[in-house]
Regions:
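Short, charge-dense linear interaction motifs
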Residues: 1-220
């Protein structure tokens, strides 16, 4: 019977974020479906015009999710029974814009969003421009850790490592994201700011990531 040893290695890396991901959400409700659809399209055009005025390609604003659903509300009838009535059509449009991490540019974008007539909700994330390279580095560290542990175990057990029989990795999504601005009041940025810009002074921490790989070796 073939003898094997199975060892799980853990990789850890710290990556400096170099990209800002701006998540933008628009939603509103209208009595007519056509009005909801038209208002959504018009609002997105306003945002694209705004970003275009800041020097970005209009196509840089990417749609993540779009939907229009019927909305109902509960009410109490004269006989005290609860009923539902049609409220309207609610659209939800979620988008993102990614750009190189730059506090000055971020300040201009936040100022424009705060003074935008469509008043979108938004959040800010820091990430990396090349996540695949970071993932590969993370996997490499996990493999190295597995090999180091396997050699220690083999030496302690007085056996010799043979060929690798199997490498097991979940291939789950690894999202390199830092959120230093969980709560942001744009009013706090008003003081001493340039015209049409907020004074942002943000230095995001490195993104710490970990992942595991399980390797099976023959032993003799």
């Amino acid at each position: 019977m073939e003898r094997t040893i199975r060892v799980t290695g853990k990789g850890n890396i710290s990556v400096k974020p170099d990209t800002i991901r701006l998540r933008i959400s628009l939603e509103d409700i209208f009595r007519e479906y056509d009005d909801a659809l038209r208002h959504s399209a018009d609002s997105v055009e306003l945002l694209k015009d705004m970003f275009g005025g800041l020097g970005y390609d209009r196509k840089a604003l990417k749609t993540l999710y779009f939907n229009i659903n019927t909305e109902y509300e509960s009410y109490q009838d004269r006989d005290k029974s609860w009923k539902r009535r049609f409220k309207g059509y609610k659209y939800t449009h979620r988008m993102k814009l990614e750009f190189p991490a730059d506090n000055k540019q971020l300040g201009k974008i936040l100022y424009a969003l705060a003074h935008c007539p469509v008043s979108p909700e938004f959040s800010i994330e820091y990430t990396v421009a090349d996540p695949e390279a970071a993932k590969n580095e993370l996997l490499g560290e996990a493999i190295k850790d597995s090999m180091a542990k396997a050699n220690v175990l083999a030496t302690a057990a007085n056996v010799k490592l043979g060929n690798i029989v199997n490498i097991d990795y979940s291939w789950g999504e690894v999202d390199f994201v830092s959120k230093p601005l969980e709560e942001l009041s744009l009013r706090c940025c008003e003081d001493a700011c340039e015209p049409a810009s907020y004074n942002m002074d943000i230095e995001p921490d490195d993104i710490d990531m970990a992942d595991t790989v399980t390797v099976v070796w023959n032993i003799a």
